[in-house]
Amino acid sequence: MKLKHLLPLTLATLLLGFGSAEAQTSKPKSQICRIGLEYQMSYNENWGANRPIILSIEPNSPAALAGLKVGDIVESINGRSLKDLSEQEFVEILQGGDAAIQLEVSNFSYKKKSRTLQPECHDRSLLDERLLAQAFAFYSLEDESERAIVYPFDTGREGKTSFENFGNFAFADESKALSSTDIALNEVIRKQLEAKGLRYDASDPDIVIDTYYTLARNPYFDAKKAKNADKLWDVRIDPDQKSLVQVPFLAVGADKQLADYVLTMGIRIFNGRNLSILLWSCEAVEHLTEEFSIEEYARLSIPMMMGQFPFVRYNINPKWRIATHRHNYTGLYLRTSDLGDVAYVVPNSPAAKAGIRANDVIVAINEKPMAMVDQLNAAYRLFVENTLQYRDESTMFTNRNGVKYCRYWRKDSYSSIQKQIAKEKYLSIFSYLFGFRPYILGERSTPYYTFDVLREGVTQRLNVMPELHDNSYITLD
């Protein structure tokens, strides 16, 4: 295996994005700004026709703090209707700098609701801990990676009806006694619809939900093939835990003769005023290598199926992204030219409370010495190369940024990994970003991290209590 195919976004690569602005634009920009949302222009009549739809919101980002939600339709920006703006003009306002942006957004439970979006900006020559965690991701891919998972769903919609004025929903055949499985499915769907802003009202529903499911033997199953197969499982997103779980499902596109069972589950949404009109549907056809609980499948899969209501992006085999971003936060901004140089400390942050100030020089963290950027980068690459034996081959994946052969740590090697990280030659000072993991710092007698800082010629040790920031989210890719 060639190391160049394995390496993550290294610090040197990351710093290229903070280089000379003059080389990138005719008007130099001294700041880089973060908003924390993704959007797509809608070109269907069901939801937000010819307006931007918010697709994802990064937790703890300016977009999240503004109260924006996935599925919001952007009606206006800084007082200008999106009907009068091109997409390019919309983007230029979003990327206009650090000035507050006024948005009006609509969803099921509100119309033209005002939201104030305040971009988070800092000098291009600085790095915060969120970006540092990306640069040093291979210390803990379990906490810093993005993966795409494809689902075997087929989604359809009626093309002309607007869903924007729907307010209430109910379930079909509510007068009949329901099985425990039916009740479980309805509960998952109800939770999803209520989170989108719809209300349950069996007396006057705008839409009516119907479900069906089967678990049957696969008539094309080839036991001999299955016995000789290398892999009879896949991973799926657990939407409750925002993590990946191993399941006895075949990956999309795998040989279906390896599956002993076929599970089919469907959701249909009908017009509550005319039940003959099917507005939206999604069907999952899953090939299983062993029996699996219908209720557990519903818990794992219905949130992903309902992720395309009301705005359909994929008709078949939708791709979901699980973005895992967890790191220790102290509130430091460091200079890209010298990562020991503290440029800014966020007020009331753990670092500020511990007494770290701007213009302090970090000498060491947890007794691991600081070094120059090129030294840190070389030592990090060496660490990645020399610890391949501790990676779990069964967890191999390609990160969303294109890095191949990514693998999580082997759980039976945590002690060995911790010993490697502790070696002086690896200059693993920034492993503190993932210090909440047992394979980083091992057993500790104190929750504090030690920061040795040089101030006015005197080195002093300060104890910092970091905060765990979890900015993980799930979105259609």
Show the residue positions of the predicted features.
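Surface-exposed short loop/turn segments
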Residues: 29, 212-275, 433-441, 445
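N-terminal segment of the mature soluble domain
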Residues: 168-227
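PDZ/PDZ-like peptide-tail recognition elements
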Residues: 23-56, 92-93, 126-129, 299-347, ...
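C-terminal/domain-edge helix-coil "capping" segments
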Residues: 108-112, 120-158, 278, 284-337, ...
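Second-shell loop/turn segments in exported
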Residues: 59-60, 79, 170-180, 197-198, ...
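A structural "domain/chain start" motif
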Residues: 45-50, 66, 123-184, 337-338, ...
